[in-house]
Amino acid sequence: MVVIEIGEQAHRLRDITSAMSHPRVLWYHLILPTYGFWLPNDPRGSWSTFVGSWELCKFGRATRTSEKRSLAHEAHDRELRLAAKRALKYPPVRFDELQRQAIADGFATAVEEGGYVVHACCVGHDYAHLVVARHERTIERIASHLKSKATMSLTRQQMHPLRDFTTRDGTIPTPWSAGIWSVFIDDRDHLNSAIRYVERHPAKEGLAPQRWTFVSSA
């Protein structure tokens, strides 16, 4: 049988197929890094596609290695890493308090539009954490929707961190990294741990507790 995918039906078919390929996934711990937060060619690494410990997410996305231990604290050429950051086209993005509120406003819009269920959310200096229930859409599409509405909110409120780099045609570079991290959650204990982690995370960033209207209890 040949299936021809057209427009939104194509997205829907791919999303349903993706969900079926991970039948045990009930929730996701989604991490959205900002532009410049981490470089994919960082000389450090770890043992899997996702950083095994959430605490190590702050050290960035890992490159694959055969090591059975974390290499996040391994000695590496710090100057090389900093030079790579300096070579970025735009300055690394860090959100201030007003920008974090604008981002949350955008997230709220996406949650309402998509009918997503979010159990926890932290908007930090250079990334956002969310615990999201499984949905007919893929986590990649949900992430794209969240980032899009957050960016629109920043732009509308004239708080876009890269507005000084607006092009002649009015385009502003995205404040988000192209990639995301998503940790699959398939049991209630893991869910509760993820929620606690995200709820406590603002304090680790030196931020006040965050309470968002689009977050619902699990």
Mark where each language-model region is.
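Short catalytic/metal-binding and nucleic-acid-binding patches
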Residues: 1-218
